[in-house]
A protein has these predicted regions:
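Acidic/histidine-rich, surface-exposed loop or edge segments in extracytoplasmic proteins
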Residues: 42-54, 142-151
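Positively charged n-region of N-terminal signal peptides that target proteins for export
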Residues: 1-6
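Short low-complexity stretches enriched in small and charged residues
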Residues: 21-23, 45-47, 153-159
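Short, contiguous acidic and Ser/Thr-rich linear segments
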Residues: 53-61
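Ser/Thr/Pro/Gly-rich low-complexity linker/stalk segments immediately outside membranes or between
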Residues: 26-47
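Hydrophobic membrane-insertion alpha-helices, especially the h-region
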Residues: 9-27
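A cross-family detector of function-defining hotspots
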Residues: 32-34, 61-215
Length: 215
């Protein structure tokens, strides 16, 4: 497969677990400057093989471009991990085409901006991993407005996707992976489309995430 399976599943799992809290939050779609009319299954690749979705091009379009597309109700968190620091965020509510949901994302790493943010933000200790995280206040978001978006993950909140829906919109997946923890199935299934840069995740609670990353 041309897509790094480990990368897309790792990012998807982080966003998927973290996103569960978003489903219970009240929805209020903010004013959007440049709303995308593309449904979540319409994607393409640029000449450089970067994912194009919702009018954005990953690794090129910036956080500011994403704000213009998805609205300004955005939150950023900086995570310290074994593989290095990572800035992740989400739009609590947005609309793409006729669909309403949350939009999670990661940014291309910029060590200088991340170091500045860590100096000014208050760290929190992750209970399980022991790693530090920094929930960035709105005034620190400006540090990252020009940073390119690395990945996106759309979390629809008003529709239920089935395996047949996934295959009908994206085609037959190259691989289907059942997520396991401690050798036990979690009920979460990944439908991988490496040539498209797409990972569709369905869980046993009928929740779904469509993740987009450049192949």
């Amino acid at each position: 497969m041309s897509m790094k399976k480990e990368t897309i599943i790792t990012v998807a799992c982080i966003l998927f677990v973290g996103s569960f809290a978003y489903f219970g939050l009240p929805m209020f779609v903010p004013r959007i400057e440049n709303q995308s009319n593309q449904p979540f299954w319409e994607t393409s690749l640029s000449d450089n093989k970067d994912m194009q979705a919702f009018g954005l091009t990953l690794n090129q379009s910036t956080l500011q471009n994403a704000i213009d597309t998805f609205g300004n109700r955005v939150s950023l968190t900086l995570y310290e991990t074994e593989s290095g620091d990572q800035v992740e965020g989400y739009f609590r509510e947005t609309q793409v085409g006729p669909f309403v949901g949350r939009m999670a994302f990661t940014l291309v790493n910029n060590p200088t901006d991340m170091a500045t943010a860590k100096e000014k933000a208050i760290p929190e200790q992750a209970p399980m991993s022991g790693n530090k995280s920094y929930k960035l206040p709105p005034e620190l978001n400006e540090l990252f407005l020009d940073e390119p978006v690395f990945s996106l993950a759309f979390i629809p909140t008003h529709i239920v996707l089935t395996p047949d829906d996934v295959k009908g919109r994206f085609g037959e997946p190259a691989q289907i992976i059942e997520e396991m923890i401690n050798n036990k199935k979690t009920g979460t299934v990944h439908y991988l489309y490496p040539e498209k840069g797409i990972d569709v995740t369905l869980d046993k609670e009928k929740r779904s995430i469509i993740q987009y990353i450049s192949p």
